[in-house]
From Swiss-Prot:
It comes from Xenopus laevis. The lineage of its organism: Eukaryota, Metazoa, Chordata, Craniata, Vertebrata. GO terms for biological process: nuclear-transcribed mRNA catabolic process, deadenylation-dependent decay. Binds the poly(A) tail of mRNA. Unable to interact with the cap-binding complex and is therefore unlikely to be involved in translation initiation. GO terms for molecular function: identical protein binding; poly(A) binding. Residues 93-170 form the RRM domain. The keyword Lipid metabolism does not apply. This is Embryonic polyadenylate-binding protein 2-A. Residues 1-26, 169-218 are annotated as: Disordered. CDD domains: RRM_II_PABPN1L. GO terms for cellular component: cytoplasm; nucleus. Gene3D superfamilies: 3.30.70.330.
Length: 218
């Protein structure tokens, strides 16, 4: 007995299989997920190119928490490069604050030193690997006389810890801060007023008369 298969004109077997695949909800979900992953990859790729174009610094060892440019206005981000003279001028208006509580913020430090004068910038130093605060900070004031007022805050209590406040030093490249110069005492091994390896001028003094017999103690 022969079996007939009736087919409608214009309908191919391949077309029917494709239509069934499109109607499969699981296949639709997989395709939608793949499309979302591709869009996410393109978005991340675009963000990576944007970071390279603006030159984001990868070093978090010195993190500028807050920079107060004007009254009530704060900006975040790395400071702009400064010349040597500008750094000297800023250091003369800045103080070092040690033993700072790790949970202390720039706002906390500003409130603690607000009586000393107007503050331009507060920098909290962080570890370059972990990003955690190192426990000290620098505060830049608008006026030099504010440094003297801030030094009087030495050994005050900040967030339960006694802090250390000192004027900020200017580190000059190639010059050691421990080299104070000046006289350092008599050099070792000095035998006369001539350097090692040089013979004294003239004949050495040997006394008068003939030498007597040598008396050995033993």
């Amino acid at each position: 007995m022969s079996e007939r298969v009736s087919e409608e004109p214009g309908l191919d077997k391949g077309d029917g299989a494709e239509e069934c695949e499109l109607d499969d909800p699981e296949l639709k979900a997989i395709r939608m997920r793949v499309r979302e992953m591709e869009e996410e990859a393109e978005r991340l790729k675009g963000l990576s190119g944007q970071d390279k174009s603006i030159g984001v610094s990868p070093r978090p060892c010195m993190k500028l928490i807050h920079s107060k440019m004007t009254a009530g206005e704060y900006t975040e981000g790395p400071p702009r490069p400064l010349s040597a003279e500008e750094k000297k001028e800023i250091d003369k208006r800045s103080v070092y604050v040690g033993n700072v509580d790790y949970g202390g913020t720039a706002q906390d430090l500003e409130a603690h030193f607000s009586s000393c004068g107007s503050i331009n910038r507060i920098t909290i130093l962080c570890d370059k690997f972990s990003g955690h605060p190192k426990g000290y900070a620098y505060i830049e004031f608008a006026e030099r006389n504010s440094v003297d007022a801030a030094v009087t805050m030495d050994e005050t209590v900040f967030r339960g810890r006694t802090i250390k406040v000192l004027p900020k030093r200017t580190n000059m490249p190639g010059i050691s801060s421990t080299d104070r110069g000046g006289f350092r005492g008599r050099p070792r091994g000095n035998r006369g007023n001539y350097q090692r390896g040089q013979r004294p001028r003239g004949r050495p003094f040997r006394g008068c008369g003939r030498p007597g017999p040598l008396n050995h103690p033993y």
